[in-house]
Amino acid sequence: MDLNKIFHLYGPHTPEQIVVHNTSRGKDDYRMVHIVEYPSIGKTAIKIAKNSFTTPERVKGWAKLIEHYCSLGIYCPRIIRNKNGEFCAIIDGYLVFAEEYVKYQTASGIDKCATGQHRYEQKLYESIGLVAANPAPSVPWHTAYCLYDKFDESEEYDENYECALAIRDYYVNHIPKYAMQAKSLFDEYCRRREKFESRYRLLPKAVFQGDINESNILVTKDGDFAGMVDFNLSGTETILNYAFCESFCSLDDDSQIDMLLDTEALKKRDARTAQRLGWIGKHYRFTDIEKESFNEYYNIVAPFRWTYHSFFLSLLKNREKYPEGRKYAGIILDWIAFQMTGKDISSLLP
């Protein structure tokens, strides 16, 4: 890869290299960010990627979505056109684009003791509602949260189905005591999914940033919400699905595992989820069909939400970190069954 050729897309002089961030995820997902400084345009983030979801079409879509977010008052570093007037270029087989250098720090880099734990949270969730209430034109790709569709065409299933399948298979192959229960829950999940699909397809959609985490949330020096960065997982998404997936509280570590069957603890976590959905509801009014569909949707998605799924499998598989993790195998399945049968879920929506 010729870095000089890449750098000269944005200025006639070789820039000063400040730092390089490697965010690659395996040999099929190459992602590098070079923070450089040009004499003419100052600091710039040059991004180099080679994977199945970073394409010229998507980069153009990200640029338009970033402009839309900015027009709503949500700060996002813009994608810069190169010397040829294009948003991206292919150099030696790698896709290259550049963004303005970010004006704010990320939430992962702030002192939460000084600014207040997640002080930015309310405005962050309000921004989701603002985007939902003022939707950008749809794009022909999805976020990673998509249900019934695939984020990446190379994938076999959507994320939620993949999580449900992984849970079933692990129990069947490694914890035979609970294999029948796991298979029964998976079969019920599949039955409900199939029945719900036609209704789900009718729910309203919008285009979202698609990857809210502390490294992508921008905050002021006081810890207040400022905006977002990193739109490479953005896409068209069902509003109810996106709102819920970003709001559903997960477990942080094994010290919280006992709350899975603690009714009062679950109520507190539900209250946090409801509060986040309420903040989204400041700008976005959930429609009647969304409210009528929510209980059925929740019974399908919540039991196998990725945040819980990844923690559960780590608890069961990582014997070094969790030497007694498998003693929770039955509790995990009981929690999944509880989430699949809840009947008062619609009260979480504003």
Where do the language-model regions lie?
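ATP-binding pocket architecture of kinase catalytic cores
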Residues: 39-142
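A glycine-centered beta->alpha junction motif in the catalytic cores
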Residues: 96-114, 169, 303-319
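ATP/Mg2+ or Mg2+-diphosphate-binding catalytic cores
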Residues: 282, 302-350
